[in-house]
Amino acid sequence: MNLNNDHGPDPENILPIKGNRNLQFIKPTITNENILVGEYSYYDSKRGESFEDQVLYHYEVIGDKLIIGRFCSIGPGTTFIMNGANHRMDGSTYPFHLFRMGWEKYMPSLKDLPLKGDIEIGNDVWIGRDVTIMPGVKIGDGAIIAAEAVVTKNVAPYSIVGGNPLKFIRKRFSDGVIEEWLALQWWNLDMKIINENLPFIINGDIEMLKRKRKLLDDT
């Protein structure tokens, strides 16, 4: 998809900011079919490393997925720890099988491992620098993760969390306004409509966005 200069960057352009070789749109860089990323989500690398370098212990045999929505901002050094990092916990945690030389016969089956499922990140999520996201975590739309947080549990939509251990800081909006943002789902609108309404999206003018959405639904 090619957009002219009046309609924002091309989401298929890996390096969308001229002269900046660190900030990269993620989707066009992905080669792993178990990593699914929406358009316009970016990773601001430290030294030009690829986003996939930040997804650790992601083994095909396990089949877990990393799923990220649209318009997410992911800070430098953020890492995603997938289920392959988990060791057995019902006896010794030492991974004898990795060293082979006769120990390979003690390879655990998947049912023996404490698998947590996919990592799922919603849309319009802001993740600060050097955040660690653990296996199976679900982060809701519009959430903010403070720098250097270790995310070990689910994060509700439009909430702010941080720290290690992870702590809830506050909601970004009242419950009613959060429900309105979630119902609106502006990130799923056609890009032409998003561009026309960017002032309202950026300024959080939910009432104007609701009126605009109603007009669209009525046409």
UniProtKB/Swiss-Prot annotation:
GO molecular function, one term: acyltransferase activity
Keywords per UniProt: Acyltransferase, Antibiotic resistance, Plasmid, Repeat, Transferase
Domain of life: Bacteria
InterPro entries linked: Hexapep, Hexapep_transf_CS, Trans_hexapeptide_repeat, Trimer_LpxA-like_sf
GO biological process, one term: response to antibiotic
Catalytic residues (UniProt): 87
Enzyme class: transferase
Enzyme Commission number, as recorded: 2.3.1.-
Task of the protein: Inactivates the A compounds of virginiamycin-like antibiotics, thus providing resistance to these antibiotics.
PANTHER family, per the entry: ACETYLTRANSFERASE, ACETYLTRANSFERASE RV3034C-RELATED
Family: Belongs to the transferase hexapeptide repeat family.
Name this protein carries in UniProt: Virginiamycin A acetyltransferase
